[in-house]
Amino acid sequence: MSIYTLGIDVGSTASKCIILKDGKEIVAKSLVAVGTGTSGPARSISEVLENAHMKKEDMAFTLATGYGRNSLEGIADKQMSELSCHAMGASFIWPNVHTVIDIGGQDVKVIHVENGTMTNFQMNDKCAAGTGRFLDVMANILEVKVSDLAELGAKSTKRVAISSTCTVFAESEVISQLSKGTDKIDIIAGIHRSVASRVIGLANRVGIVKDVVMTGGVAQNYGVRGALEEGLGVEIKTSPLAQYNGALGAALYAYKKAAK
């Protein structure tokens, strides 16, 4: 008889769920673009169950991770650190992974992984610089969609420095560049390098070991990924499942619990 497990990743800006069959096959997934403290987690759970044509009672084990994991007491059988879940999820997609760079809405994590287990990490959760929130703020100033940043930045022909690592000061720099008539596409490329520089500082403290993978919502932005590759001097892999990585790791740990 098959074992189905549910992994829930309650982030600061999005709620993600994955249902796994026998610890091997992804049956369904869901993403709701609001996170902890909202209806997002409940909606994401409802959506993933609907997508799988299953009920909550069909789940052998449910495990929650992420910033808002403790809000799911009574719904999840267990809560677990997102660091461990990201290490596990990344190892499922990329068996040779040794470094995970996770850029979420409100924090950045660089995790060293050995055989699916976290062995070291560095994290920035005190400042928005280098996070998805930073990109949201910058896109708002530039009056562009955050989803368009990568494509626009790729057209840049002139190097513009956005040197402040603080979001407030970087905001002032961007406004100053706009007032000088600097092309938006060059500013965007500079913003991508600014995000990368913040992440590189964390990565160098952990130590970069190949294979390197990028997870989290910002992994979709190939401008940031390219700036990281340039700054670190390594190829960085990603996947369409990058934003679901924490939920995937949670579902895998749930399977380990259920299969005991």
From Swiss-Prot:
What is the catalytic activity of this protein?
ATP + H2O = ADP + phosphate + H(+)
Q: What is reported on the regulation of this protein's activity?
A: Inactivated by exposure to air within less than 15 minutes.
Q: Which InterPro entries match?
A: ATPase_BadF, ATPase_NBD, CoA_E_activase_dom, Dehydratase_Activator_Redct
Q: What EC designation does it have? A: 3.6.1.-
UniProt keyword ATP-binding present:
yes
Which pathway does the protein contribute to? Amino-acid degradation; L-glutamate degradation via hydroxyglutarate pathway; crotonoyl-CoA from L-glutamate: step 4/5
Which keywords label this protein?
A: 4Fe-4S, ATP-binding, Hydrolase, Iron, Iron-sulfur, Magnesium, Metal-binding, Nucleotide-binding
* Binding site residues for ATP: 12-16, 220, 243
Q: How is the cofactor bound?
A: Binds 1 [4Fe-4S] cluster per dimer.
Molecular function, one GO term: ATP hydrolysis activity
Q: Name one GO biological process term.
A: glutamate catabolic process via 2-hydroxyglutarate
Q: Which residues form the signal peptide?
A: none
- Judged by the first EC level, this protein's enzyme class is hydrolase
Q: Which Pfam families match?
A: BcrAD_BadFG (PF01869)
Residues reported to bind [4Fe-4S] cluster: 127, 166
Its needed co-factors are: [4Fe-4S] cluster; Mg(2+)
- Family, per the entry? Belongs to the HgdC family.
Q: Any idea what job this protein has? A: Involved in the fermentation of L-glutamate via the hydroxyglutarate pathway. HgdC (CompA) has a very low ATPase activity, whose the role is to activate dehydratase HgdA-HgdB complex and then maintain an appropriate redox state via an ATP-dependent electron transfer. The dehydratase requires only catalytic amounts of ATP and substoichiometric amounts of HgdC (CompA) to be functional.
Q: What is this protein called?
A: (R)-2-hydroxyglutaryl-CoA dehydratase activating ATPase
Q: Which organism is it from?
A: Acidaminococcus fermentans (strain ATCC 25085 / DSM 20731 / CCUG 9996 / CIP 106432 / VR4)
What is this protein's gene name? hgdC
